Amino acid sequence: MNELKNKLIGEGKENNILDYNEFLFLYRIGIPCQSRHILWDCLIDNPCGITNDIFNYYSQQIKEFDFNMQKADILEKINHNKPSGEDEEDELSNKIIIDMIKSEDLFINELYILQKSTSEILSKIYKLIYIFFLMRRDIPYNKNIINYAFVFILVFNDEYTSFKNLYNFICSSNIIKYLIKDNNYIEKNIDLFNRLMKKYTPKCYNHFNNLDISSELFSVFWFENLFTQTLNYKIILRIFDLFLIYGDELLFQIGLAIIKIEEEDLINYPINEIFKILRRLPNKYDEELFFENLDLINIHDYYNNYISKTNLSDQLDFLCSESLVTY
């Protein structure tokens, strides 16, 4: 991916698609919709070697699918306590459809705003997810992939290109560590976010500490679905733009930006209201305000220092260099 970034972004235009200043400007104002699929395709690349032939091979294993018909069938089975499936493939199919039904209202709202066909998009999402888990039987089913599939279908529309980028995005980034429940990785991220809250949002850190609220209760939720269940999709698409460049560091920066924006309410509201705020922010969340706050939070040096030292044998020295952060 780094080689592609270098080709995409350089000091000048001679051998690059964009020069560095143009690139920063695009990312600051948001990549135009008509350019997003080109940039994502370049940045994600295809390290897993997903070809059209591979996609077609697995596509042929899927029965003709219409989301609305399958939804009606599943709901009837649930209402009448009928068996949901007889084999592994049926069980996978039913899990996907049930989780898509639970997310349908969110998708419909976004698709209405974007003037997209709901039934067609949802059928494509199902196909992408089903093929992904057919190919990666080593990964336990995880409903968060529905949100990722929705994002990639919105950007690419074409089924093969959407799947190729979705598969490579998940399997060649740390996102997969949330899908497989890598506890060491997740616990390290929780610890880092606690430390960052203490440093950058001390009022909320102290308030949460007094209420015995652990950041684990919301940060893991944010990170494992890349904020797709928390923010509206205009913001989400721009977050994915940035994530493809900055990677995991951006997740912590976004989390701090949300807490900073909502700080006044978070330190004055009771626990149940705090979780409502942190789980699902209003659809009319101001896009420009969000990215202005994001720009103000610079964690780059602290983040790199933490990651480098926790990856080396002197991890203990780093942990002892600050007072232990606990909730």
Model-based region annotation:
Residues 1-285:
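Internal, helix-rich recognition cores of eukaryotic regulatory domains
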Residues 22, 256-327:
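C-terminal regulatory/linker segments that are acidic, Ser/Thr- and Pro-rich
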